[in-house]
Amino acid sequence: MGAEGNEPRYVISIAASILGIKTHNLRYYEKMGLIQPLRSRGNIRLYSERDIARLRQVKTLTEDMGVNLAGIEVILRMIDRVSTLQERVEELEIKLGRTRK
């Protein structure tokens, strides 16, 4: 997902409806640090497509795989770290390709 995936689009009720969960679950996930939606000037939570994708991961891990929230936190941290490392590898491969020319 590009930068457009980070644009805040959905208020909490719409995000909950998209995901098929209750709004209090979204508030709890935020409190636990699993998700951090942007806030409007009026302090309204706004969820991006990237947030929705992450919340789908949370839902899958909890409902389908029975992982508790502490486990989900660790898994999401590892996913983020792997993603960061993959981006770094791609950058280094590009640099290496330039130096070989």
Which residue stretches match the model-derived regions?
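Basic helix-turn-helix/winged-helix DNA-binding cores
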Residues: 1-56, 60
